[in-house]
């Protein structure tokens, strides 16, 4: 493990998802300890997207972005938290980092959480925000031809599911997928999913519990677990980042390979010495490189 990251391991609480309410409290405490990047160059606004039910979003607009007549590029961003934890506040540091690093308008989505709201609630919320963003692009100052979806962990899996659904339903055009350590496969059969039993923060048992909460009694579909999709053709280009010590690692590597075989352009980065979510340790040099690359990949993909 990267020495700078290893020094922080004792500070990470050992948590499980047996009690979702308690897990959310611990997750909020951990997120509150993450330094919030400077928002001086951002206009931050809370909005509500009309849907059934309404979906809260937080919009981050970089002030320094060069004005473009047809509007700014945008990212619909979905937070991590195993489908069970997280909200607009816990995601504030990440969304701020991405907006500052990319110069792109970031729309952070406060989707409904499992187990109270199992699949497809979170996916429906995410898709509703994508449609709203595209339909109201002019009012939002956004270029409808430069909209990306992305997310971390469970949010990365949601973003991949949104891309599949948009393709199948001929929904809004998605320019790019930004998938950071995404949760893609409920079957948990890969080597990393089976063997990473004691990795920091996120391990085999926690991953399995997250999927149980999210799916409930319903069978998994490709929209819930994108690795189950048989056809990955005609999807948006993707950037996929994996962490070496992460149960999701191998399913992410396999998904990237399958996208390539389906004719989808993919940029893949496997970060050695890192673990799931270790980018939150922003003082570490490797975390700074990871976060900078997320912004740079998005900036390249959405360039006018």
What is each of the regions a protein language model found here?
Residues 1-62, 288, 302-304:
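A glycine/proline-hinged amphipathic helix-loop "lid/cap" segment
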Residues 89-108:
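Short amphipathic alpha-helix adjacent to the substrate-entry channel of hydrolases
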Residues 117-139, 294:
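Alpha/beta-hydrolase active-site loop
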Residues 134-149, 169:
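Gly/Ser-rich "nucleophile elbow"/oxyanion-hole loop immediately N-terminal to the catalytic nucleophile
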Residues 151, 155, 159:
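Gly/Ala-rich beta-loop-alpha elbow adjacent to hydrolase catalytic centers
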Residues 164-218:
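Hydrolase active-site cap/lid region
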Residues 240-242:
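Short beta-strand/loop motif that positions the catalytic acidic residue
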Residues 283-304:
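Catalytic active-site module of serine/aspartate enzymes centered on a nucleophile-bearing elbow/loop
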